[in-house]
Regions:
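C-terminal nucleotide
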Residues: 2-13, 38-72, 167-303
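ATP-binding N-lobe of GHMP and related small-molecule kinases
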Residues: 1-114, 118-133, 138-142, 147, ...
Length: 303
């Protein structure tokens, strides 16, 4: 029943190319979309943060003076994690009423959770971040690790914080360096298709693939897969299981495809860019086993 003091927005995203490379210290090329999470906020003077959403009948209250832990409802754990992270970063927080509305489809692969986390962080800081972009993204990433149980990479939170209209974001997930890549040619249309197949990042499949990549890197004598190459992978093929080999082959190939895609965009070579996107899908389907019949059909139709 209160009037908001302000509002913040955090967009969802699609990843043009660079799939499952972020947690392997590779390169990614996401772009923000118009679907977004909006948070209306109003300060309180009692140290209580009240969380409500148009997408849930369940609300949550968090006492900033008490230890912040996971609790029901589950959707609010993403917010609780951000509150805990901001406190740990030394940000002085006040009580707040926050009301969320989101047009990012849940479980559709458009980073609804990251946009919720970023919107929470921005709202808690009164609409103006006192942190640099990467630090805020890392706080939101840690929230997802610790409070949602998903060992995600840094990409989703980063593009939600740093996304700009008409530009994709090339991110080096090892150094944290970013570059805005123009993606606004009027001849270009980015079609985002919904397969209607839902996913859960915390269902175990994501974590299993991450672990397989880390195991492969260890066998290859590298801190992360980013730090090795295709020749080393082939030379040590017999030391890896078939699954580990295929996971590593995807990651190394995807890192190269991502850099090649940026070069293609810079040359306005959209045909090559499209070929690289298709090659990425084939690798995700065959080596990473993360596609589905519906997605395969959409790619086949597009080609």
């Amino acid at each position: 029943g209160r009037s908001p003091e302000g509002a913040v927005r955090a967009p969802g995203r699609v990843n043009l190319i660079g799939e499952h490379t972020d947690y392997n210290d590779g390169f990614v090329l996401p772009i923000a979309i118009e679907r977004e999470t909006v948070a209306l906020f109003a300060r309180r003077d009692d140290g209580i943060v009240n969380l409500a959403s148009t997408l849930s009948d369940e609300t949550a209250s968090v006492d900033l003076a008490a230890p912040i832990v996971k609790a029901a409802p589950a959707w609010a754990d993403y917010c609780r994690g951000v509150l805990a992270g901001l406190q740990a970063a030394g940000i002085e927080l006040s009580g707040m009423d926050i009301y969320f509305d989101s047009t990012v489809p849940l479980g559709g692969g458009l980073s609804s959770s990251a946009s919720l986390e970023v919107a929470t962080g921005l709202a808690m800081m009164g609409g103006e971040s006192s942190l640099d972009d990467l630090t805020l993204a890392k706080i939101c990433q840690k929230a997802e690790h610790d409070f949602a149980g998903t060992p995600c990479g840094i990409m989703d939170q980063s593009i939600s914080v740093m996304g700009q209209a008409g530009k994709a974001l090339l991110m080096d997930c090892q150094s944290g360096e970013t570059q805005q890549i123009p993606f606004n040619d009027p001849k270009l249309v980015l079609l985002v298709a919904d397969t209607k197949v839902k996913h859960e990042l915390n269902d175990g499949g994501y974590a299993a693939r991450r672990d397989q990549c880390y195991a492969a890197a260890k066998i290859l004598g590298a801190p992360m897969l980013r730090d090795t190459d295709a020749a080393t992978l082939e030379a040590k093929r017999d030391a890896l299981s078939d699954v580990e080999f295929r996971r590593a082959r995807h990651v190394l190939g995807e890192i190269k495809r991502t850099l090649d895609a940026v070069a293609a965009l810079g040359a306005d070579d959209y045909h090559t860019f499209g070929e690289l996107m298709v090659a990425s899908h084939v690798s995700l389907r065959d080596d990473y086993n993360v596609s589905c019949d519906e997605l395969d059909a959409i790619v086949d139709l597009a080609c």
